[in-house]
Amino acid sequence: MGLELISVIVKDYDEAIAFFVDVLGCALEEDSASLDADNRPKRWVVVRPPGSGCGILLARARGEEQEALVGRQFAGRVGLFLRVEDFNASYRHMSAAGVEFLTDPRSEPYGRVAVFKDLYGNKWDLLGAA
């Protein structure tokens, strides 16, 4: 058993792909046409962080209820955790790309960590080795 995908609700597929691939360094694994439950066209977009067993399904918001949750999926808490091999290099790259970090890097018993927001405001932990 394993966790295959998590969903992140996005406003726009292409801007989300650009952020996850160009800024976070994820691989674009799939971007294909599909249909939703109401038989309306959509895209099936999956990105995956390097070395991760779990991918991220970029799900475009449909309707007011979903649009209101973009960037608020975790009710203001850190809800996503991105572990990287080289914390300092990733932090520098993301900072240079304009990512908003809410905390300075710090050391915790589980490693180096800094909290950042994705392009929609969801909070993430950037994690690295201690």
Predicted regions located by residue number:
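Core segments of cupin and vicinal oxygen chelate
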Residues: 7-54
